[in-house]
Amino acid sequence: MATSRYEPVAEIGVGAYGTVYKARDPHSGHFVALKSVRVPNGGGAGGGLPISTVREVALLRRLEAFEHPNVVRLMDVCATARTDRETKVTLVFEHVDQDLRTYLDKAPPPGLPVETIKDLMRQFLRGLDFLHANCIVHRDLKPENILVTSGGTVKLADFGLARIYSYQMALTPVVVTLWYRAPEVLLQSTYATPVDMWSVGCIFAEMFRRKPLFCGNSEADQLGKIFDLIGLPPEDDWPRDVSLPRGAFSPRGPRPVQSVVPEMEESGAQLLLEMLTFNPHKRISAFRALQHSYLHKAEGNPE
């Protein structure tokens, strides 16, 4: 099916994954988001899409069968405009008008009510637990790709795209923010699903602060800002396979969470620290975070 079926309405934005367009499906009247990517053709006599891209798209289509409420829907996939070297693949997603960044900016002072934050976090974690249960690491969670519908439903977007888009991203000189990146990513160590839980912690704090928690301007600067809060981790937790040694950072102890998020109650601070745990093997999972008492008790009630 061709993308010409959809009527372009507006350019939504340009990011690491290329240009995103809002379009209308004239058959249903629904709005969709079109994300196009250039993929280098595979080798072999027939050329065509590389098998890795075919597998990634097949996985996204398989997830779609579950219709998880907290994951943005993939409506269609179109391959068009083939040349000898590359194919344009267009992913057609459901369109949601605002992301979490816009949602937070629109909240009147003093910000979101705590119960709203807890509701958003429960939905966020349910969507992420679903992705992790299906062996998908998002790798780029940030407020801009967490969508919030007008009815308050959270939907995760841009998951499963990192490998599909690796070629496009090499062609697109967009600065990717470091602010939500886990220490193991900043150190260029091996990583898996725990990287997403670090990002969740950064976003959790931002829901209260209404500004990012760690704003570094390089990998080393970002790590320094992280250690200013959680303290310099012990030698045993420092990954072995990295070029940046622990000794590059001055010793420092942890600071109380309330020094950066004063509005957060103690059990919320405990949950945040379990997300912002340096060692990924000790970091809380999305499944376990969903069971945490903080997300199941009313504000101000005892444990």
Curated annotation (Swiss-Prot):
GO terms for molecular function: ATP binding; cyclin binding; cyclin-dependent protein serine/threonine kinase activity; protein serine kinase activity. GO terms for cellular component: bicellular tight junction; chromatin; cyclin D1-CDK4 complex; cyclin D2-CDK4 complex; cyclin D3-CDK4 complex; cyclin-dependent protein kinase holoenzyme complex; cytoplasm; cytosol. ATP binds at residues 12-20, 35. It catalyses: L-seryl-[protein] + ATP = O-phospho-L-seryl-[protein] + ADP + H(+); L-threonyl-[protein] + ATP = O-phospho-L-threonyl-[protein] + ADP + H(+). The modification N-acetylalanine is found at residue 2. It comes from the Eukaryota. InterPro entries: CDK, Kinase-like_dom_sf, Prot_kinase_dom, Protein_kinase_ATP_BS, Ser/Thr_kinase_AS. It is found in: Cytoplasm; Nucleus; Nucleus membrane. Its EC number is 2.7.11.22. Its main location: cytoplasm. Residues 50-56 are annotated as: Required for binding D-type cyclins. Phosphorylation at Thr-172 is required for enzymatic activity. Phosphorylated, in vitro, at this site by CCNH-CDK7, but, in vivo, appears to be phosphorylated by a proline-directed kinase. In the cyclin D-CDK4-CDKN1B complex, this phosphorylation and consequent CDK4 enzyme activity, is dependent on the tyrosine phosphorylation state of CDKN1B. Thus, in proliferating cells, CDK4 within the complex is phosphorylated on Thr-172 in the T-loop. In resting cells, phosphorylation on Thr-172 is prevented by the non-tyrosine-phosphorylated form of CDKN1B. GO terms for biological process: cell division; cellular response to interleukin-4; cellular response to ionomycin; cellular response to lipopolysaccharide; cellular response to phorbol 13-acetate 12-myristate; G1/S transition of mitotic cell cycle; positive regulation of fibroblast proliferation; positive regulation of G2/M transition of mitotic cell cycle. The modification Phosphothreonine is found at residue 172. Keywords: Acetylation, ATP-binding, Cell cycle, Cell division, Cytoplasm, Kinase, Membrane, Nucleotide-binding, Nucleus, Phosphoprotein, Proto-oncogene, Serine/threonine-protein kinase, Transferase. Belongs to the protein kinase superfamily. CMGC Ser/Thr protein kinase family. CDC2/CDKX subfamily. Ser/Thr-kinase component of cyclin D-CDK4 (DC) complexes that phosphorylate and inhibit members of the retinoblastoma (RB) protein family including RB1 and regulate the cell-cycle during G(1)/S transition. Phosphorylation of RB1 allows dissociation of the transcription factor E2F from the RB/E2F complexes and the subsequent transcription of E2F target genes which are responsible for the progression through the G(1) phase. Hypophosphorylates RB1 in early G(1) phase. Cyclin D-CDK4 complexes are major integrators of various mitogenenic and antimitogenic signals. This is Cyclin-dependent kinase 4. It comes from Sus scrofa.
